[in-house]
From Swiss-Prot:
PROSITE patterns listed in its UniProt record: RIBOSOMAL_S15 (PS00362)
Keywords for the protein's UniProt record, in alphabetical order: Ribonucleoprotein, Ribosomal protein, RNA-binding, rRNA-binding
Taxonomic classification: Bacteria, Pseudomonadati, Planctomycetota, Planctomycetia, Pirellulales
Species the sequence originates in: Rhodopirellula baltica (strain DSM 10527 / NCIMB 13988 / SH1)
Keyword match Cytoplasm: no
Protein name: Small ribosomal subunit protein uS15
Family: Belongs to the universal ribosomal protein uS15 family.
A family per Pfam: Ribosomal_S15
Gene3D superfamilies: 6.10.250.3130, S15/NS1, RNA-binding (1.10.287.10)
Assembly and binders: Part of the 30S ribosomal subunit. Forms a bridge to the 50S subunit in the 70S ribosome, contacting the 23S rRNA.
Gene Ontology MF annotations: rRNA binding; structural constituent of ribosome
Biological processes per GO annotation: translation
Length: 89
């Protein structure tokens, strides 16, 4: 599922270093997390929607790669991101 433009701007302002910061890994991970949460809710009611399931797996995979990149660059930043977004353990 897509997220609204307003919600996307909120996420960018919350996680970005500057107002227009859309490229930093933190912002990208936060936006992907919002989209993943929306699709997860969709999948709870539409269990047999296999096309959406495939899209969800792709988003999770993309987020995983970004998280791996951040963990390799700066482990403390990685821990901050997963703590702030409430993902992982």
């Amino acid at each position: 599922m897509t997220i609204s433009k307003e919600r996307k701007e909120e996420v960018i302002s919350e996680h970005g270093a500057a107002a227009g910061d859309t490229g930093s890994p933190e912002v990208q991970i936060a936006i992907l997390t919002e989209r993943i949460n929306g699709l997860t809710e969709h999948m709870r009611t539409h269990r047999k929607d296999y096309a959406s399931r495939r899209g969800l797996l792709g988003l999770v995979s993309r987020r995983r790669r970004l998280l791996d990149y951040v963990r390799g660059q700066d482990p403390q930043r990685y821990l901050d991101i997963i703590g702030k977004l409430g993902i992982r353990k």
